[in-house]
Amino acid sequence: MAKKVAAIVKLQVPAGKATPAPPVGPALGQHGVNIMAFVKEFNDRTASQAGLIIPVEITVYEDRSFTFITKTPPAAVLLKKALGIETASGEPNRKKVGKVSREKIREIAEMKMKDLNAASIEAAMRMIEGTARSMGVEVEA
């Protein structure tokens, strides 16, 4: 018989740098999960992606065991990394922070394709372009 799910916890944690401190500790502690076991396993799985923020979906079962799925980093994080900027524009319609090429958009869209709700790579590219525009990043035609 399948285990009964007690909770699903969604977090965004820096790759390879999970600690029992907030936000991880309190989110898992309230469900009685062994926090150190999660931290160790998450850091081992994401060590190769250092510097990126990784969304993780933790499924907690009634017997306090857990499983988790790591997803691809958010599009905004990938765009900031591609452009080498720290923060996006506070006023995206007035102040632009950089330009991104269609090739870079395609690369990011291909990387995120499995997590996006898009039927084609073109649709995924349009989603990434929308994220870029909302961050104050110009998309080269």
UniProtKB/Swiss-Prot annotation:
What keywords are annotated for this sequence in UniProt? Methylation, Ribonucleoprotein, Ribosomal protein, RNA-binding, rRNA-binding
State the SUPFAM superfamilies in the record. Answer: Ribosomal L11/L12e N-terminal domain (SSF54747), Ribosomal protein L11, C-terminal domain (SSF46906)
Pull one GO CC term from this UniProt entry: cytosolic large ribosomal subunit
- Superkingdom, taxonomy of origin: Bacteria
* Modification after translation: One or more lysine residues are methylated.
Could you state one GO biological process linked to this protein?
translation
UniProt keyword annotation of Calcium present: no
Q: Any keyword Ribosomal protein? A: yes
Q: Where are the transmembrane segments?
A: none
Q: Name one GO molecular function term.
A: structural constituent of ribosome
Its job: Forms part of the ribosomal stalk which helps the ribosome interact with GTP-bound translation factors.
The record ties this protein, via PANTHER family, to: 60S RIBOSOMAL PROTEIN L12, LARGE RIBOSOMAL SUBUNIT PROTEIN UL11M
Which family is this protein grouped under? Belongs to the universal ribosomal protein uL11 family.
Describe its partners and assembly state.
Part of the ribosomal stalk of the 50S ribosomal subunit. Interacts with L10 and the large rRNA to form the base of the stalk. L10 forms an elongated spine to which L12 dimers bind in a sequential fashion forming a multimeric L10(L12)X complex.
What HAMAP family has UniProt attached to this entry?
Ribosomal_uL11
Stated name of the protein: Large ribosomal subunit protein uL11
Taxonomic lineage of this organism? Answer: Bacteria, Bacillati, Bacillota, Clostridia, Moorellales
